């Protein structure tokens, strides 16, 4: 090692952000191991690397004692005072023992240490960068795929998109650019492992936060997301300011905002409904685009019984129960849907017991603004 090597470490520190001092200390520690392995395993030594010219010196560290039992680790008081009269018992004396051919070992060791530390530092920098991006969106480029993962280049690292996190309505080809949600960042022996998703509800949430300024600045709050990726999703939104239309803000002028998100999700249908702290109103809104006649609420069991017009029953339940299922996920309430005629037969339209809260929705509540966006067409259900 020489001054050029030390200059190289200085450059490395500037370009890679790897501390020069940390590398030198690692080299010194590695050289101690190298010395013991090649010259004297039992000796207690210290290796000193000159920070200016890169020269290396090895010192044996010996304890000052009255009587020497192990000359490799101890030195007599008389001999120590011959070096420096100020030494006393229990002091430590350092004696240079640098081997003549130690430079070759030092050069090999230094190269290995620097390579390892650069690799570790780069992995650490990448991990620190991506751990802050958990639960966020990044755009990557599809590289390849196997029967378990699609490998997506995120610039500094390759992320893994598991089969279970891939949308069923889209296929992926080499060099495709995709937006994905970072679900997990883990340290491994091979470096950071980044797991991403195209199906996570967080992807839809972040897309709205990025696309709708009112959500980004807090004017509109996205309260909940329920998603069956690639097919249909529901989100509930709320604004403290009564003059702000949270649904309209998310839809955007002529549906432009939500349509951008629909396009990104390859045509996934999105229902945008108004959130309410009143479970009766919230559940009714969540079942959009279906109309609701009445909602009976059981607070203790967190269940609701929803009555809809006969001609709206199929719409309320949805294909394979999807609309009701998403509404339940969105609100956190169990939902049992019955047609108006069935409810009449069961006497459910009569006054309920005091333990159940009921509300027959008036026309104003039933017409609470919601939006359903399917493909390139944005419309508001009446």
Curated annotation (Swiss-Prot):
The keyword Transcription applies. Residues 348-382 are annotated as: Disordered. The keyword RNA-binding applies. GO terms for biological process: DNA-templated transcription termination; transcription antitermination. InterPro entries: KH_dom, KH_dom-like_a/b, KH_dom_NusA-like, KH_sf_prok-type, NA-bd_OB-fold, NusA_bac, NusA_N_sf, S1_domain. It is found in: Cytoplasm. Residues 135-199 form the S1 motif domain. Pfam families: KH_5 (PF13184), NusA_N (PF08529), S1 (PF00575). Residues 301-367 form the KH domain. One of its GO terms (cellular component) is cytosol. Its main location: cytoplasm. PROSITE patterns: KH_TYPE_1, S1. GO terms for molecular function: DNA-binding transcription factor activity; RNA binding. Keywords: Cytoplasm, RNA-binding, Transcription, Transcription antitermination, Transcription regulation, Transcription termination. Monomer. Binds directly to the core enzyme of the DNA-dependent RNA polymerase and to nascent RNA. Belongs to the NusA family. Participates in both transcription termination and antitermination. This is Transcription termination/antitermination protein NusA. It comes from Halalkalibacterium halodurans (strain ATCC BAA-125 / DSM 18197 / FERM 7344 / JCM 9153 / C-125). The gene is nusA.
């Amino acid at each position: 090692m020489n001054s050029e090597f030390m200059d190289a470490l200085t450059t490395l520190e500037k370009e890679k952000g790897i501390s020069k001092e940390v590398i030198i200390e690692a080299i010194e520690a590695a050289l101690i191991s190298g010395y013991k392995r090649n010259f004297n395993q039992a000796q207690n030594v210290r290796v000193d690397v000159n920070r200016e010219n890169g020269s290396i010196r090895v010192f044996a560290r010996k304890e000052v004692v009255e009587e020497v039992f192990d000359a490799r680790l101890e030195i007599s008081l008389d001999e120590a005072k011959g070096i420096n009269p100020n030494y006393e018992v229990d002091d430590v004396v350092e004696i240079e023992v640098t081997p003549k051919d130690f430079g070759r070992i030092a050069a090999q060791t230094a190269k290995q240490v620097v390579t390892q530390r650069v690799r570790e530092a780069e992995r650490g920098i990448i991990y620190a960068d991506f751990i802050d991006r958990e639960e966020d969106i990044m755009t990557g480029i599809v590289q390849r795929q196997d029967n378990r993962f699609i490998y997506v280049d995120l610039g500094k690292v390759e992320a893994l998109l598991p089969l279970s996190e891939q949308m069923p309505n889209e296929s992926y080809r080499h060099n495709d650019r995709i937006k994905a949600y970072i679900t997990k960042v883990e340290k491994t022996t091979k470096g950071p492992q980044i797991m991403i998703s195209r199906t996570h509800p967080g992807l839809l949430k972040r897309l709205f936060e990025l696309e709708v300024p009112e959500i980004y600045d807090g004017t509109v709050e996205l309260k909940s997301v329920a998603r069956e990726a690639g097919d249909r999703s529901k989100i509930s939104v709320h604004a403290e300011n009564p003059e702000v239309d949270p649904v309209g803000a998310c839809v955007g002028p002529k549906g432009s905002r939500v349509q951008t998100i629909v396009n990104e999700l390859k045509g996934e249908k999105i229902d945008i409904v108004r959130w309410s702290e009143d479970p009766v109103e919230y559940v009714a809104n969540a079942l959009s685009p279906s109309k609701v006649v009445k909602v009976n609420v059981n607070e203790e069991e967190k269940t609701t019984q929803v009555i809809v017009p006969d001609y709206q029953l199929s719409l309320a339940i949805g294909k394979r129960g999807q609309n009701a299922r998403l509404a339940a996920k969105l609100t956190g309430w169990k939902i049992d849907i019955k047609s108006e005629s069935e409810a009449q037969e069961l006497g459910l339209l009569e006054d309920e017991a005091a333990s159940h809260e009921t509300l027959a929705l008036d026309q104003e509540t039933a017409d609470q603004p919601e939006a359903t966006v399917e493909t390139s067409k944005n419309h508001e259900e009446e």
